From Swiss-Prot:
CDD domains: nuc_hydro_IU_UC_XIUA (cd02651). Belongs to the IUNH family. GO terms for cellular component: cytosol; nucleus. This is Uncharacterized protein C17G8.02. It comes from Schizosaccharomyces pombe (strain 972 / ATCC 24843). GO terms for biological process: nicotinate nucleotide salvage; purine nucleoside catabolic process; pyrimidine nucleoside catabolic process; pyrimidine-containing compound salvage. GO terms for molecular function: nicotinamide riboside hydrolase activity; nicotinic acid riboside hydrolase activity; purine nucleosidase activity; uridine nucleosidase activity. Gene3D superfamilies: Ribonucleoside hydrolase-like.
């Protein structure tokens, strides 16, 4: 298996990264945002929200609340409230109606307001920023598809586009499809077919996120932290773990899908990928399936995506706990 990620490491695991996060918070989105906020070598340029785990109203409110609790002076921009061509599909069976079921420690009424300009804000910020930008998406790809369709030149200043989604095998919302891709398959297909992203596009699929499991030992380590936000992390991950056990029967830990996407952006050497051709099925039986040419058998279709398949799990959690220590200084 070829590691195609180290070439983006720029010589140091602590090289500064400029990132924009497009998200649909969501329990694991909250942890992903926390990781980015606590990493000393990361500048969050902006946060945009999209339909997904719940409605846009709640994903936006949740993002605002997290940024406030983390003392982050980062603007939140509301994006697409529905898919490009279909009715919305929400993950309320996992995240509850408000996206953060069972969580009581986030502000009910965030002080800042979001602006309804996600696509334009992404374009102007990324295009005008004096350094290359890493774009990370942890929800359905509706905002990203609209960005690429409306402002195709934006890819000139995108160093990497990393999205959590897809699978080379089974799904988690249907037998065939992973939720983020299923929630807007047309958007995902448009993104994957964007030629100007070839070489920059990274998919973080279920294959690898189901290897990075947050278990009782990690939760116990989080309990030992004295800062207030650690209590929020413990609460939300405990609820998330219980839900996964009830819905999927997974008892040895909960996959932190979206955290993996942010961690790939910030610590590239922890991950191993394979370049392959990937597209999205729009057929009714396999709707939302990411069709992956793992063994390069379809020679007429050149590789367009770096698909992340392996992680250094022990080093991941060691890094994660070390970064969360910085919560005391936010």
């Amino acid at each position: 298996m070829t590691n195609t990620i180290d070439s983006f490491q720029k010589g140091s695991a602590l090289e500064n990264y400029n990132i924009w996060i497009d998200c649909d918070p969501g329990h694991d989105d909250v942890v992903a945002l926390t990781l980015a906020a606590c990493a000393g070598h990361c500048k969050i340029l902006g946060v945009s929200t999209v339909h997904g785990n719940t409605t846009l109203e709640f994903t936006t409110k949740n993002a605002l609340a997290v940024m406030e609790l983390l003392n982050q002076d980062v603007d939140v921009h509301a994006g697409a409230a529905k898919p490009l061509m279909r009715e919305s599909a929400f993950a309320t069976h996992i995240h509850g109606t408000n996206g953060l079921a069972g969580i009581s420690l986030l502000p009910d009424y965030p002080k800042k307001k979001a602006t309804p300009d996600a696509v334009f804000a992404m374009y102007t910020t990324i295009s005008n920023y004096p350094e290359p930008v890493t774009l990370v998406a942890t929800g359905p790809l509706t905002n990203i598809a609209l960005l690429l369709a409306t402002y195709p030149s934006v890819t000139d200043n995108i160093e990497r586009f990393i999205f959590m989604g897809g699978s080379t095998g089974i799904g988690n919302i249907t037998s065939q499809a992973e939720f983020n891709v299923y929630a807007d398959p047309e958007a995902a297909r448009l993104v994957l077919e964007t030629k100007s992203l070839i070489g920059k596009l990274f998919m973080v699929p279920l294959d690898v996120t189901h290897k990075v499991l947050l278990d009782a030992n990690i939760i116990q380590l989080l309990r030992q932290h004295s800062n207030p936000f650690s209590s929020t992390l413990v609460e939300l991950m405990t609820v998330f773990q219980q839900t996964y056990e009830n819905v999927y029967g997974i008892r040895n830990g909960v996959p932190v899908h979206d955290v993996c996407a942010v961690a790939l952006a910030l610590w590239p050497s922890l991950w191993t990928s394979r370049s392959m051709y990937v597209t999205v099925s729009l057929d009714s039986l396999t709707l939302g399936r990411t069709v992956c040419d793992v063994w390069s058998q379809q020679n007429q279709y050149p590789a367009n995506v770096h698909v992340v398949l392996e992680a250094d799990v022990s080093l991941f959690w060691e890094t994660f706990i070390g970064v969360i220590d910085r919560l005391n200084y936010l």
